Swiss-Prot record:
Name the record gives this protein: Cytidylate kinase
Alphabetic keyword roster: ATP-binding, Cytoplasm, Kinase, Nucleotide-binding, Transferase
Family statement drawn from the similarity comment of this UniProt entry: Belongs to the cytidylate kinase family. Type 1 subfamily.
Binding positions for ATP per the UniProt entry: G12, P13, S14, G15, A16, G17, K18, G19, T20
Length: 226
């Protein structure tokens, strides 16, 4: 990793608002963007497409090594291209998310994708969105943020998103899924979900996105000036 390229990492649990924050930060700073969670979803989706067991390291490592994925920014969105196909919508399905969390718990698969993630570091800078960006992937990042929110608040946000799409879902089911994913991510043996020791921890439970962006930018600008 080059010490010359400024890297901003944003870690945190699912539904805390990392994607929105990272998109806005990358636009305001003019930096490249990496959605590491999408990479795991892409691998999980590739496994599903190719009939590969999402819990088999032996089968997943070769797939991860040769994963053909691109991130293409368009307007306020980042299109994810897998093997030439836009899979952005398919990546957001609950089935894909649960499979991705299983994939991310496998040590050799994480190792295979680590080099791919680090290759996104390029001038003028990078905003990296994930769960272990500041602790594992970019431990020397100039600025590290851990964005959190209560499980209940994250379930409410997800409920609204799905209802806005016309889907019939239950709050209790979403809350249980989020709590199960949190437990799996926080207690996995490799790269468990936790703030880096030198990270700014932001709890977005009662904050607007504008407030989160403002606090994050103040912190980032102070770190980049050091």
């Amino acid at each position: 990793m080059s010490s010359q390229t400024p890297v901003v990492t944003v870690d945190g649990p699912s539904g805390a608002g990392k994607g929105t924050l990272c998109m806005l930060l990358s636009k305001k700073l003019g930096f490249q963007l990496l959605d590491s969670g999408a990479i795991y979803r892409v691998l999980a989706l590739a496994a599903i497409h190719h009939g590969v067991d999402t819990e088999s390291e032996d089968a997943l490592v070769p797939l991860a090594t040769h994963l053909d994925v691109q991130f293409v920014a368009e307007g306020d969105l980042v299109k994810v291209i897998l093997e030439g196909e836009d899979v952005s919508k398919e990546l957001r399905k609950e089935e894909t998310g649960m499979a991705a969390s299983k994939v991310a718990a496998l040590p050799r698969v994480r190792e295979a994708l680590l080099r791919r993630q680090r290759a996104f570091e390029a001038a003028p800078g990078l905003v990296a969105d994930g769960r272990d960006m500041g602790t594992v992937v970019f431990p020397n990042a100039k600025a590290k943020i851990f964005l959190d929110a209560s499980a209940e608040e994250r379930a409410h946000r997800r409920l609204k998103q799905l209802q806005d799409k016309g889907l019939d879902v239950r709050f209790d089911d979403l809350l249980s899924e989020i709590q199960e994913r949190d437990d799996r991510d926080r207690n996995r043996p490799v790269a468990p979900l936790r703030p880096a020791e030198d990270a700014l921890v932001l709890d977005s439970t009662s904050m607007s996105i504008d407030e989160v962006v403002e606090k994050a930018l103040q912190y980032i600008e102070s770190k980049l000036a050091e």
